[in-house]
Structure formats: structure tokens, C-alpha cells
Amino acid sequence: MKGKRVLVTAGPTQESIDPVRFITNHSTGKMGYAIAKMCMLRGAEVTLVSGPTSVAKPEFVHVVDVVTAKEMYEEVTKRAKDQDIIIKAAAVADYRPKSVSSEKMKKKDDDLAISMERTDDILKFLGEHKKEHQFLCGFSMETENMLENSRKKLEKKNLDMIVANNLKVEGAGFAGDTNVVTIITGQEEVLSLIHI
């Protein structure tokens, strides 16, 4: 990987509801940070665009901190054209509240409904604007039909590779130091890795 420019995304995003509350997911960023570190150790020039996480920043990696899906979209898309490899490991919010209250929302006796809107699709943009020399890898967290859903995502988003995992499999998912993944390429090659 010496001399290659690699962009990695990691962690969750946070979408504010009010100044106190936000919507997020269980991503810790560990996978993306580990990938960024390994690419750097293999000689790559690495940029890591990271959502909020407590994982220690890897040395000799340029880290760009973001909070929201919009910020991650902006930071990734403005850097994408200059990258040889893009690995999107971040668990970016698919939806955000349509409006954010400027004051803390007070508790009431009735139910609360929050109107949501789609966030910009980072992988869709990357796939549509992929340069001839670029390698694009995405991640797919599933709870059912993992292979089928991941293959569809690989094709729809114009990816070269997708790393799929099933949240219901023991040892897979968020927060752990191990994972159980299946790597799928455009040539229908499937490689299952246990506890990486």
C-alpha cells in the first residue's frame, strides 16, 4: 500500500433533537480505526473521517472529526476524488430530525413524535463519482438475509467490495474487540472470516 492514498470513515454520527438529546447508534469506531492504522502501517497515506468515539486516534493518520451525517458527507465527498482507496466503515445515520429544537424539549404526559428526513447517501455519491483507478469498499450490518442484502448494496452502490456482518451472530457487531464478517466482491467471491 506504499504511496496509496486511503480514506477511511469510522464511528457513528449524531443527529440532534434538541440541545440535550440526539439520535445515534451503537458504533464505537473500532473497526474503522483498526483499518486506518493497518493501512498506515503498510505505507499508505491515510485520512480518517471519524464520528464521535472514545477510541484513541491512531498515530501518523490525519484524523478529521465530524459529528453529523451532513458533516461526514461534506468531508468525505470533498476528498474523494484524490483517493486511491475509500473504505466506508462508519455507521452513518440514514435519517435525521427535520427540525431541531433550540430549547430543551420538556417532558409531557402525551407521546412525542419526531418527523425525520433522509440524510445524504455517502456511498451512493462515491459509487456514482468513482474514478477509474479507485477501489471502493462499503460495510453492511444486517439482521437477516445478510448475503442477499449485501450483494444488492454492492451492486446498487457500485462498490468493489463489501464487508458484511450479521448483528445476530455471536461475536459480531458493535463494541467488541472481535467481529465475524463475510467479504463479498464484485466477482461474487465470498470469504467468511471469523473473529477478526
Predicted feature locations:
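Phosphate-coordination loops involved in phosphoryl transfer and adenosine-cofactor binding
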Residues: 2-4, 133
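Glycine-rich phosphate/diphosphate-binding loop of Rossmann-like nucleotide-binding domains
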Residues: 4-68
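Conserved phosphate-donor
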Residues: 5, 160-185
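A short, flexible beta-alpha/helix-coil linker loop
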Residues: 13-16, 144, 188-190
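Short, glycine/acidic-enriched capping/hinge loops at junctions between secondary-structure elements
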Residues: 18-21, 149, 174-175
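Glycine-rich phosphate/dinucleotide-binding loop and adjoining beta-alpha-beta core of small-molecule
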Residues: 40, 45-170
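Short active-site-adjacent structural elements
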Residues: 146-147, 170-176, 191-192
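Conserved small/polar residues in nucleotide/adenosyl-binding loops
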Residues: 194-196
